[in-house]
Amino acid sequence: MEALLASSTIVGLVLMTIPAAASSSERTTSAGSIANVPYSLILEDQFLATLHYLPVSFVPAVHRPAPTPTTTTTVPPTTTTSSSTTTTTTTPTTFSASTSTTLATSTTLKPAKIIRHDAKWPAALSRRNGRFVWRFADLPAAFRSQWHVGTANIIVVGALMRFQNVHNLPVTGNMDTTTWLTLLRAVLARQYSPTSYNFVYVQEALPEHLTLYQNGHPTFSSLVNTGIAVSPTEIGTHAVYLRYTSQTMSGTNPNGTHYSDPGIPWVSYFYGGDALHGFIRSSYGWPQSLGCVEMPFVDAQTLWPQTPLGTMVTVQ
């Protein structure tokens, strides 16, 4: 794997934070305090999807009221011996309950405990009945298979990293108190993601190449080189966690010799020492690197602005 070294222009850092206690200043409308909203994975999914940080949308269920029962009431006679009737209706008091949360692919989730809204927090922050559906039809199956409702999967981790980065929070991909309260405020303020949903798909089938998807549409492609057999690129879906405009890469070759390559441009790390970056080769499209995904300088420069922290990278 290609090592991380100090001679670099750093753009993003991954920092770990300890969740802090909620501040008494975290108050909102008279409907209640956002500090009272209990965290759950389902709510995290719902809010990140609502703000367009996920490749899925949350579609609230359409409320269909139950049929109104009809009763017949006999009106006492007044001046005659005959009786007349009139029809009246009564509407019983009911409470809606969630039954399940479903994916468009018919993957179902067992019902979670229902959080019934009360005055402790704004109604907009209560869990709602509904389902999650894919926003984009053309995303590869290898990527789509990573999404599961109500789990800390890599797609949710990447979305949370992206949210943290946009809101100038430490980018950990982990939920903490500060991130949760910031997410709740963003939902109330309808602060949607300011960028398109970007995804990088690296295919090792020859000739090796990558494709950039923006909001589900392929917008850019490049021939690339992935890792050789003794130092392969990590297969799977990962999140960009560290970026440099330029870096000196140094480490040890498989034969034990040392290497040091200064001025490696447009670097986006997505798994350990594996990164997307520019590198000069006589040809591209077949395994040549020590784990990174190499491409021509000009292509790396085009791709780099579209791979902010939290961007998903699938290697297949």
Question: PLM ranges: what are they?
Answer:
Residues 171, 193-195, 232-235, 244, ...:
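Exported/periplasmic cell-wall-interacting domains
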Residues 1-259:
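Cell-envelope/ECM-targeting effectors and their regulatory/trafficking segments
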